[in-house]
Amino acid sequence: MELEEDLKGRADKNFSKMGKKSKKEKKEKKPAVSVLTMFRYAGWLDRLYMLVGTLAAIIHGVALPLMMLIFGDMTDSFASVGNVSKNSTNMSEADKRAMFAKLEEEMTTYAYYYTGIGAGVLIVAYIQVSFWCLAAGRQIHKIRQKFFHAIMNQEIGWFDVHDVGELNTRLTDDVSKINEGIGDKIGMFFQAMATFFGGFIIGFTRGWKLTLVILAISPVLGLSAGIWAKILSSFTDKELHAYAKAGAVAEEVLAAIRTVIAFGGQKKELERYNNNLEEAKRLGIKKAITANISMGAAFLLIYASYALAFWYGTSLVISKEYSIGQVLTVFFSVLIGAFSVGQASPNIEAFANARGAAYEVFKIIDNKPSIDSFSKSGHKPDNIQGNLEFKNIHFSYPSRKEVQILKGLNLKVKSGQTVALVGNSGCGKSTTVQLMQRLYDPLDGMVSIDGQDIRTINVRYLREIIGVVSQEPVLFATTIAENIRYGREDVTMDEIEKAVKEANAYDFIMKLPHQFDTLVGERGAQLSGGQKQRIAIARALVRNPKILLLDEATSALDTESEAVVQAALDKAREGRTTIVIAHRLSTVRNADVIAGFDGGVIVEQGNHDELMREKGIYFKLVMTQTAGNEIELGNEACKSKDEIDNLDMSSKDSGSSLIRRRSTRKSICGPHDQDRKLSTKEALDEDVPPASFWRILKLNSTEWPYFVVGIFCAIINGGLQPAFSVIFSKVVGVFTNGGPPETQRQNSNLFSLLFLILGIISFITFFLQGFTFGKAGEILTKRLRYMVFKSMLRQDVSWFDDPKNTTGALTTRLANDAAQVKGATGSRLAVIFQNIANLGTGIIISLIYGWQLTLLLLAIVPIIAIAGVVEMKMLSGQALKDKKELEGSGKIATEAIENFRTVVSLTREQKFETMYAQSLQIPYRNAMKKAHVFGITFSFTQAMMYFSYAACFRFGAYLVTQQLMTFENVLLVFSAIVFGAMAVGQVSSFAPDYAKATVSASHIIRIIEKTPEIDSYSTQGLKPNMLEGNVQFSGVVFNYPTRPSIPVLQGLSLEVKKGQTLALVGSSGCGKSTVVQLLERFYDPMAGSVFLDGKEIKQLNVQWLRAQLGIVSQEPILFDCSIAENIAYGDNSRVVSYEEIVRAAKEANIHQFIDSLPDKYNTRVGDKGTQLSGGQKQRIAIARALVRQPHILLLDEATSALDTESEKVVQEALDKAREGRTCIVIAHRLSTIQNADLIVVIQNGKVKEHGTHQQLLAQKGIYFSMVSVQAGAKRS
């Protein structure tokens, strides 16, 4: 099950390269660990458990063949009575009575034997199951911890080449596969093997001739079973592969749903999903055909072997070589032995799967990183001055060894100095910072602190003296205080408050309802960019680091936050050695040294003035920025600073910034939901009334011809079993009732022939039954998955905001619901019909032949059935509970793995390990409990079988002596009822599946029938031929549906004429991005209206409306496909030509970069575009928006993530793109919007000021103060 590989080899057919790779990997044999290595984590107690469990399993396995010995002797007793009474017609009543009394006495003894075996089984079956489960639970607990420790111990370079999603899968799926393979399944395997050997030994000792004849057909049976298993597992593999690819598409699409909706990509994504489903369906149908041909063939062979065995056996009895009891003992012993091999095969398969999974898991556990963050070795200097030096550093990333990043870097930083690194995107600035933390080691050269090579310093110690603030700060899904505590384990609340004040975050935190105990949400999604950044700064400050690394720490902030955060950083730098990376050069003017990077080396160094005189790289970058940046404050600039400070800055971070359902920037492309597979169980099991059986069948109604044929065959199959019982008892009756040898010979020939006919019928009916239901089931699964996905893509954005509908929850639902519905319709339905027919026919026949014994058996059967149901119930209940509890640990693991860089920089690996270990405690205790529960229920169901034999044959003997029944009829009733009951037991084991199916069906029906308020698929609404591009908001009131109590827009009115550029400014969280989302019609306003060319947008066709808009957001989401496909995604209504893609790339100034890549436009961008830098992603996103040729352009902070040079060219590209288009721009960097036709200042959800740059400066209001703050920062 190369699920991981599939997730990596993401979803699209056209990526033939990927396809080839996975095919090649498929062919190679999967590596597995040796049998003994599987148990490398077993302690002495586990070994004892396994040893005793194995002995118990062997004893349990021998019980069944032993019972057959008794059964044979018992048949002989009956036969002798039958023969005597037949042959001696003149027997006196007294003799008869004496004979029957002797028979009853013998039967009582046999009943005691049966009971004794049952009592033994009760004990050993419990030991067998519970001991193996205990041993497995204990080992898995260790493996989980070791594995998580190993992941936390790897170096960053290792993570670059391993897929994060894959590690999560390994941690959940692979470890549970090991669990499956090393627990009670091994006990069951030994039990089956003991039965096999026991059966054959008894067979050979009691009658070797007959054993050899039966064995002649066994290899054929075994071989066919083996081939069947092989074919089936290869189809299952391929089918899972196809489903995994479909799942990967769904996950990617749902994680980027806002991007998909904005660009109208629903149809394209549905097709992509459907192609993978089509493949899975095709394989599923093939699987159904092969599986059922083999199934039919197996039944044919089994019946043929019965025919042969009974024909030969009866010959031996007639020639007086064997007794009839001997024939039955040999026949059943060998048969049970042979079947036990078949029963062992799923256990062998589970063990083989476990070995394969263990190979991957142990490989990671054994992988020793070259940079070991847990290592105790290395120097820990008492006193660090903070003199840093990079000496002739050469470096390339492990994931792209061919691209050299640093080519001989030399740089010295003196203690207490601030050094700024400047240069273009991708020139190696961030790499330098990463080498300083020893996230990687250089290929050549040396990094040193105070003259000491950092490779000789203890890794953990080194990272603890460094504080890092990066461009996109990662917060963990816990409280604000906890997040800051990640900076330093033993920090006090006072220190946290002090750090927060220094980072200028205190005010906004105190305004939150729970203050420091406010949960920040997944990845900090509940806070705005500026708020997150300041918490990250506080987190770095509590470490009181000797060395501070600031990688673009203020780029994501709005003006006002930026000024205060910048002040906080300036304060933080005092007395510390600091390395700063900044695209915004105004923030690094006061650095002691500015180092200009170009092509992986430093080409110039000096302070601002020196470098300006040199007129090199730095000078160029500064000129580029200031050309657009000199904010004309005119004479106003000389206003005293105090006056600016006194201006109304009430817009600080008004509490409203908390609205961010997920920070406004993320809103266009919600972050990749990190709970991935770990969907909250509540989300999946919310209370929906289960759908009725008929409702489920209705979903499958178009396949009714298949069902008619299938049900007809199923009923015939059901009748075959009782027919077998009748023939079997007649064969035995031929001998127990006595009679001349010729008649016996004729009768036994006839009955043997009937066995063969049964086989031929079953071959045809089994194949047809399985195939028809299987095909109908596959068609249904595909149809449901497609309908559900289609319906999900139809929903509006507010539906995706609902915490119940995270990406993880939805992908899980897509994968599980359809499969579970199939569980209640497909082949399961066939088996239910078949088994009901089986028991029904069985009971009718039994009542005719012996109603007294039938009633006794019908009283016992429910007890066995109830025991079976209880066992199923307990196990499925436990499984649910397990899953729910492991979800908690899964969430911790996912968070740690996805944000591993942050965990490493903060040296918090051990903290996550402790949290993970704690979260495993409850599942571990449950596993221990479950071992006993499972052991008790299992042993009870097993032992009941022996007890019921005792009761049945003892009572049967009584009925025979009373001459109410013959032995032949006792056998008939017994086998008809017991086989029927076993069949019903099989049905009852489907009950949990059926229950799941009804819940899943109701989920599906609910989603399919849900029509959203804003329906992307609707054909209704106007589609004007002409669009000018006049936009008007009139008295718009809006709150996000997930936070109805927090007002966002409170009566907002604004207007932008065609071709104009409107700029929205305001502090974080004031509702700027919301304006863009309302225009895209992601949401509808609660009051007021939005107009386009004078028409209310609610009257326009949704798809048409979005096709007129092109959007570029701050953190663009790219899909895991080629650059060309990502750009072409801009217009999904047609096939975008290669020329257009190139033209758009040139306009967005990214063509040159793409052209320099080995695969050019076919280069894959990686999951969420991870293979590209921020600036490169942004430009591809701009090209994507331009391909649309939109009438209205929406730019939400489109340049904030870029370095100076990219920004300048991208800004030019955007200016060019704006020509003749209506444009709405959101920007924190005010210099980029000076030339806007209209600037609107939003505060608390209303327009506070509007006008041109000059008009607003003259008003000396909020805008003026924001500009002054930014200009002040520049001047300083």
UniProtKB/Swiss-Prot annotation:
Q: Which Gene3D superfamilies did the record assign?
A: ABC transporter type 1, transmembrane domain, P-loop containing nucleotide triphosphate hydrolases
Q: Which UniProt keywords apply?
A: ATP-binding, Cell membrane, Cytoplasm, Glycoprotein, Membrane, Nucleotide-binding, Phosphoprotein, Repeat, Translocase, Transmembrane, Transmembrane helix, Transport
- Bias kind Basic and acidic residues: ranges: 1-15, 672-681
Q: Which SMART domains match?
A: AAA
- Residues reported to bind ATP 1: 423-430
Bias type Polar residues, positions: 648-657
Point out residues bearing the modification Phosphoserine.
656
Q: In what way does this protein cross or attach to the membrane?
A: Multi-pass membrane protein
Q: Does the keyword Transport apply?
A: yes
What GO molecular functions are on record for this protein? Answer: ABC-type xenobiotic transporter activity; ATP binding; ATP hydrolysis activity; ATPase-coupled transmembrane transporter activity; ceramide floppase activity; efflux transmembrane transporter activity; floppase activity; phosphatidylcholine floppase activity
Extracellular side residue ranges read: 67-112, 205-211, 313-326, 729-752, 850, 954-969
Taken from the record's topology, the Cytoplasmic segments are 1-43, 134-182, 233-290, 349-707, 774-828, 871-930, 992-1276
**At the top level of its lineage, which domain of life is listed?**
Eukaryota
Q: What is this protein called?
A: ATP-dependent translocase ABCB1
Organism of origin is: Mus musculus (Mouse)
Quick one: which gene encodes this?
A: Abcb1a
